[in-house]
From Swiss-Prot:
Main location: nucleus
Segments of this protein annotated with the region Disordered: 142-232
Gene: hil-1
Compartments, as annotated in UniProt: Nucleus; Chromosome
GO MF annotation list: double-stranded DNA binding; nucleosomal DNA binding; structural constituent of chromatin
Species for this entry: Caenorhabditis elegans
GO CC terms of this entry: intermediate filament cytoskeleton; nucleolus; nucleosome; nucleus
Residue ranges occupied by any H15 domain in the UniProt entry: 36-112
Similarity remark: Belongs to the histone H1/H5 family.
GO terms classed as biological process: body morphogenesis; chromosome condensation; egg-laying behavior; locomotion; multicellular organism growth; negative regulation of DNA recombination; nematode pharynx development; nucleosome assembly
Biased composition annotated in UniProt, kind: Basic residues: 159-197
Protein name per Swiss-Prot or TrEMBL: Histone H1.X
InterPro entries per record: H1/H5 (IPR005819), Histone_H1/H5_H15 (IPR005818), WH-like_DNA-bd_sf (IPR036388), WH_DNA-bd_sf (IPR036390)
Pfam families, alphabetized: Linker_histone
Superkingdom as given in the UniProt entry: Eukaryota
Length: 232
């Protein structure tokens, strides 16, 4: 009896091992992993509400928002394929309207039925809405910071613009001064030309004076000699 029971136990163990191997080889997981994110339809609606463009949100913007705010994993090509299929179904059903493009490409916005539900106050999703409030606050802070930046930049440009104008004025004044300095030597040269004949005449006057001085001693000497001769 004991030997037969041992054989039965070994046979049962072998059968269970074969069943478990077949189960794994066929690709059936032992337990399904719990999803850490809501459905793709809810995530798409949350992304469109957060982006809130009047003309619609592009698929790339929706995918970026989903990847940043939901735990969808790192396999973005797989997430993109799911997103495309859900967008096509939502456009066909009328939950989402396609403003531009065809198929899964283009821009999308909320459908009329979803907008009515939002106006009445029926929440489309529960968990992501809490995240959307935080995201909206961050977006508002970013938009405020972007609005304040242009004013500072404009002030800086104005402050920098004034010295440029003054430098231009200084450059013009320096050019004018240089032109005046260039004109000044010409005036001096003209003055020298005018003074030329005067110098010649003055030279003649000096020569005449010298001649008179030379002539005067001769007359004095003649007078002296004349007086001496008279005394003798």
């Amino acid at each position: 009896m004991t030997t037969s029971l041992i054989h039965m136990a070994n046979h049962l163990d072998a059968s269970t091992e074969e069943i478990s191997l077949n189960y794994v080889l066929l690709g059936h997981p032992h337990h399904e992993r719990a999803q850490h994110h809501p459905s793709y339809m809810d995530m798409i609606k949350g992304a469109i509400q957060a982006i809130d463009n009047g003309t619609g949100s592009s698929k790339a913007a929706i995918l970026k928002y989903i990847a940043q705010n939901y735990h969808v994993g790192e396999n973005l090509p797989k997430v993109n394929n799911h997103l495309r299929s859900v967008l096509k179904k939502a456009v066909d059903s009328g939950d989402i309207e396609q403003t531009r493009g065809h198929g899964a490409t283009g821009s999308f916005r909320m459908g009329k039925e979803c907008e009515k539900n939002l106006q009445v106050g029926i929440p489309v999703q529960t968990k992501p809405m809490l995240m959307l409030k935080e995201v909206r606050q961050k977006l508002e802070n970013i938009s405020k910071a972007e609005k304040t930046k242009p004013s500072t930049s404009s002030m800086s440009t104005n402050k920098k613009g004034k010295p440029i104008s003054t430098m231009k004025k200084r450059g013009v004044m320096s050019k004018k001064r240089s032109s005046k300095n260039k004109m000044a030597p010409k005036a001096k040269s003209h003055g020298l030309k005018k003074k030329g004949p005067a110098t010649k005449s003055s030279g003649l006057v000096h020569k005449a004076a010298g001649a008179k001085n030379e002539a005067a001693p001769t007359t004095k000497m003649e007078l002296r000699t004349g007086t001496r001769k008279s005394y003798c």
